[in-house]
Amino acid sequence: MSDEDITYLLVDGENIDATLGMSVLGRRPQSDERPRWDRVLSYIAQNNYGKVKALFFLNASDHIPMAFVQALLAMDYRPVPLASTGDEKVVDVGIQRTLETIADSDSGNVILASHDGDFEPQLRSLLEKGRTVTVIGFEEFLSNELRQLTDYGLKIIDLEREIKAFNTQLPRIGIITLDTFDPTKFL
């Protein structure tokens, strides 16, 4: 990718937090167990994704977490606090509309931090238009709909194992390839 290319990082904060809490930890994450979002941007910068515009989608239907919003702004994320009075999944709808707008434009690649299969049609459309599309999350919890897009060129990056976005090792069990197996981690 060239420096002129723009890559949009879209973070589905609700999905990442819910997956971390319910599927990985089995409880609400403590603040020191949450991703270090600055490391995500550092990883992207070090891996030639061109110019990055980072959007962090938040459900602000009940309230807006101002301390977190201020932290996001300090890390060069643009918070997108969405609200609705209906039963809509506000963050999902906001991200879907954003993906559709990017697909309708002449350029723009996407990195999506989410496990949610609801974004499959929009990501497929981007891939079919030749855009670079990457999903960040916990690989073992990625929806089948998104996983199937790897046949179309979707790249998957693990939030913990590849980006190293956490200060603590998470209690995850996953398949270990022999070339990465380190017996000392089990002794």
Name what the model sees in each region.
Residues 1-89, 128, 132:
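Domain-level signal for Mg2+-assisted phosphodiester chemistry and nucleotide/NA-binding surfaces
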